[in-house]
A protein has these predicted regions:
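Carbohydrate-active catalytic/glycan-binding domains of CAZyme proteins
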Residues: 1, 5-212
Length: 212
């Protein structure tokens, strides 16, 4: 863990949240969002392959965390290979959280140059309480293997999604646009990064957006 004060980063001792769920019990691709009620929500990848969901916990101070929950968002299709990089987006219009992730379902989409176990598409669900969820739906099929999507809102009816083209040898970042977070999303743009880039983060520093 790290903390920042006066623009200086310091490490913090100890482990505050040890992954205890999922087949491999790992914590990759963490995504955290604070809602207006002061609660921080955290989701993460629990296994490289074999899990049909992702991990979830919440906190009010980023130190003390709730009991971890496994959210089986792909339980409806047991042929699913993985659930990767769940990303949180707070939908202020509906006061709910949207979770976007990448999953591979062999044989479901045109394979392209990737093998069936690496042919990902983006899916989503929405929730107000992390107890009840909307049915899992396909969010984006750009015609190639896609992972690591993050959504940001620029204005009313103006949403941007930064995503990774996961096909070889591209492995770069592209952009799509929509009038609402559920889509429909525009065709992916041309790449705006070099190859072998992933896991984008988008931060607004008026009037610009920084993508890291």
């Amino acid at each position: 863990q790290m903390c920042i004060r006066d623009r200086h980063w310091d490490s913090l001792p100890g482990t505050w949240l040890k992954p205890e769920i999922g087949k491999q019990r790992i914590m990759r691709d963490p995504s955290i969002v604070a809602t207006p009620n002061g609660v921080f929500h955290l989701v993460w990848t629990t296994s490289w392959r074999g899990d049909l969901g992702f991990g979830y916990a919440h906190s009010t101070d980023l130190v003390n965390w709730s009991e971890e929950k496994f959210i089986p968002v792909m339980k409806h299709d047991t042929t699913t290979v993985n659930v990767w990089a769940p990303e949180l987006f707070y939908d202020d219009c509906n006061n709910e959280l949207m979770i976007v992730w990448a999953s591979c379902i062999p044989g479901k989409f045109e394979r392209g140059i990737e093998d069936e176990n690496n042919n990902h598409r983006l899916y989503y669900t929405k929730t107000k309480d992390f107890t009840t969820f909307t049915p899992t739906k396909l969010l984006f099929d750009p015609g190639f293997s896609v992972i690591d999507a993050v959504i940001t809102k620029r204005a009313e009816k103006d949403y941007v999604m930064v995503l990774k083209d996961n096909t070889r040898p591209n492995r770069n970042l592209k952009i799509s646009f929509a009038q609402q977070p559920e889509g429909p999303w525009s065709p992916a743009s041309q790449a705006f990064t070099e190859s072998f880039v992933e896991g984008p983060t988008v931060v607004q520093i008026d009037p610009n957006y920084l993508i890291d």
